[in-house]
Amino acid sequence: MKILVDENMPYARDLFSRLGEVTAVPGRPIPVAQLADADALMVRSVTKVNESLLAGKPIKFVGTATAGTDHIDEAWLKQAGIGFSAAPGCNAIAVVEYVFSSLLMLAERDGFSLHERTVGIVGVGNVGRRLQARLEALGITTLLCDPPRADRGDEGDFRSLNELVQHADILTFHTPLFKDGPYKTLHLADEKLIRSLKPGAILINACRGAVVDNTALLTCLNEGQKLSVVLDVWEGEPELNVELLKKVDIGTPHIAGYTLEGKARGTTQVFEAYSKFIGHEQHVALDTLLPAPEFGRITLHGPLDQPTLKRLVHLVYDVRRDDAPLRKVAGIPGEFDKLRKNYLERREWSSLYVICDDASAASLLCKLGFNAVHHPAR
């Protein structure tokens, strides 16, 4: 049994070798000749999987170690009788922590408290729900918009997108990319929406590039609209609009979900799905794969305020470390993908063990996802 895996999927060689012969290949472009005798294909979001790639090939199963699936023609796979699995929620925590790292940086730079801001969350799935929970644990007001969930009657106080635009100081997008249909998200943030944002608002896109109309956004910024922008995703990736990058406050190469934990979850989820598909079901404990974190433990004295939280968050991950490298190489062919391929290891907040002498600080840090314990000062 031959299994092709994206060369940038961590732990894929070790895990899938339990099930068959593993060949690691680049994801963009994928070497088509390797598909001629392969039984399974494991990809990331950079690989378009459709009829033109797989027609006439012996592939029986496709797995994507990503939460999003807009790079997969699921309808064709089903029609062709090819098994499929994604990894929903695998990188949700990573994306939430990327948003926090960005917001805390902007708050420090511009001198505001997050408690004074209302956050509008567009898309309330695995990422949106976790973001809502962590913001509300800090006492920050959130507004939710998710028309598909609202129409299904899912639990939640859902508002219209127009209401979020009117009332939110921060608008952050966490939707799939739907190019048509009743819940179309292509250019959901169009020129009209962008121009309608509150003066001084913060716009964040960490889902799919085309959810925000990049041309319209650049037009608004060039005209001097007072707006802070955080973009992790771009229309036309791996190409991007260099002029837009110059105008945004934070720009990164589609790495919001790139924690070691998130990548490992993605790999293990598709591994478990494929093992079940072939009748050799196996389960993997994530902590058996992950290395020891760089920072073992730290001690925190006193209550948890915003500057202290910012220091803790940026100790684990400071978004500026990914902004600067992109600006250095933007516009050079191949460099966007190279930054992703050679991405510096990044951990989640749970990897940081925090000893607190303040019980409320320990409790709040646990709610936020840190590994925190209370030890009273002596």
Swiss-Prot record:
Transmembrane segments: none annotated. Keywords: Cytoplasm, NAD, Oxidoreductase, Pyridoxine biosynthesis. The keyword ATP-binding does not apply. Its EC number is 1.1.1.290. PROSITE patterns: D_2_HYDROXYACID_DH_1, D_2_HYDROXYACID_DH_3. Substrate binds at residues 45, 66, 258. One of its GO terms (biological process) is pyridoxine biosynthetic process. CDD domains: ErythrP_dh (cd12158). The active site is at 208, 237, 254 (proton donor). It comes from the Bacteria. It catalyses: 4-phospho-D-erythronate + NAD(+) = (R)-3-hydroxy-2-oxo-4-phosphooxybutanoate + NADH + H(+). GO terms for cellular component: cytosol. Pathway: Cofactor biosynthesis; pyridoxine 5'-phosphate biosynthesis; pyridoxine 5'-phosphate from D-erythrose 4-phosphate: step 2/5. It is found in: Cytoplasm. Gene3D superfamilies: 3.30.1370.170, NAD(P)-binding Rossmann-like Domain. GO terms for molecular function: 4-phosphoerythronate dehydrogenase activity; NAD binding; protein dimerization activity. Its main location: cytoplasm. Catalyzes the oxidation of erythronate-4-phosphate to 3-hydroxy-2-oxo-4-phosphonooxybutanoate. Homodimer. PANTHER family: FORMATE DEHYDROGENASE 1. Belongs to the D-isomer specific 2-hydroxyacid dehydrogenase family. PdxB subfamily. This is Erythronate-4-phosphate dehydrogenase. It comes from Escherichia coli O7:K1 (strain IAI39 / ExPEC). The lineage of its organism: Bacteria, Pseudomonadati, Pseudomonadota, Gammaproteobacteria, Enterobacterales.
